[in-house]
Amino acid sequence: MDNVIGLEIIEVVEQAAIASALWMGKGEKDTADAVAVDAMRNRMNQIHMRGRIVIGEGERDDAPMLYIGEQVGICTQENAAEFCTLDELIEIDIAVDPCEGTNLVAYGQNGSMAVLAISEKGGLFAAPDFYMKKLAAPPAAKGKVDIRKSATENLQIIAECLDRSISELVVVVMKRARHDGLIKEIREAGARVRLIEDGDVSAALSCAFSGTNIHALMGIGAAPEGVISAAAMRALGGHFQGQLIYDPEIVQTGLIGESKESNLARLKEMGIDDPDRIYEAEELACGETVLFAACGITPGTLMKGARFFPGGVRTESLIISTQSKTVRFVDTIHKLDDKHRALQLH
């Protein structure tokens, strides 16, 4: 899988990032997301693969494209056996977020990117559109920190693993009212807090790289993005744990469902019998081979955003593989035609 479609999935996230970046700073988050979805889907359908969206833009009735269960790739056609190899006919699961951080793009803020993860069929946890309590930490702290422990305890462990003082640590937390207590505890423990509006996949990913000045991600965010983060962290050897949140009172928003009871019933219908289970990265992304790809839309910790110039655009992407055990950063110059359709320069 790595050798067959590795380069092509980079192009998938590049196309999504370029399309979305054209709307950076225009205050139209829905449009920035819609064009990214369209570009990502179009490029996916040019790949010789038999893909199935397991994490996407929502349920079929709510999302016209890249909905959960949608089949993508040339080899999903009825006569695919005539022009696809046996390897290409193997089913793969795909988790996507064509524009992670739509508000960031709309308001010209840092940290937005186009992301996807792929694995063989059954290799990615089909997370419901719920929230998830998350803990991400550097590889040195893998298996030592634990989401069941307090933030203070985990900060002490991370500091010891990195041979640093707690006062040197920076923890990323999403700026939400539900995190007021967590933020207070982190600061009282002596660490620093970097608040973000959106985009916790980028924050989780940054924990696994030295020199980013991000040492942990804590708090509650979207569950689908948790699976994508887990895929990246598994490939990077970093620590990631997640626990589904089904109680609207904890999240303090009405976006999770009408009630705790209805959410529990929905989880049971999905086959999730233990709603309080703590998931490790290896459970959320359990496939033998997992690939993660991302491309910066706006400037971020690991990648610069899309930069336009007369006649073209330059992007920075990365691809991470559990198969080859590599992290590749890709700096690409694209030539743009009159319709702003990106074509890679050779």
Swiss-Prot record:
It is an enzyme of class 3 (hydrolase). Its EC number is 3.1.3.11, 3.1.3.37. Mn(2+) 1 binds at D33, E57. Substrate binds at E100, G101, T102, Y131, R176, A177, R178, D198, G199, D200. Homotetramer. Mn(2+) 2 binds at D97, E100, E225. Pathway: Carbohydrate biosynthesis; Calvin cycle. GO terms for cellular component: cytosol. Its cofactor is Mn(2+). The keyword Metal-binding applies. SUPFAM superfamilies: Carbohydrate phosphatase. This is D-fructose 1,6-bisphosphatase class 2/sedoheptulose 1,7-bisphosphatase 1. Keywords: Calvin cycle, Carbohydrate metabolism, Hydrolase, Manganese, Metal-binding. GO terms for biological process: fructose 1,6-bisphosphate metabolic process; gluconeogenesis; glycerol metabolic process; reductive pentose-phosphate cycle. Catalyzes the hydrolysis of fructose 1,6-bisphosphate (Fru 1,6-P2) and sedoheptulose 1,7-bisphosphate (Sed 1,7-P2) to fructose 6-phosphate and sedoheptulose 7-phosphate, respectively. One of its GO terms (molecular function) is fructose 1,6-bisphosphate 1-phosphatase activity. Gene3D superfamilies: 3.40.190.90, Fructose-1,6-Bisphosphatase, subunit A, domain 1 (3.30.540.10). It catalyses: beta-D-fructose 1,6-bisphosphate + H2O = beta-D-fructose 6-phosphate + phosphate; D-sedoheptulose 1,7-bisphosphate + H2O = D-sedoheptulose 7-phosphate + phosphate. Belongs to the FBPase class 2 family.
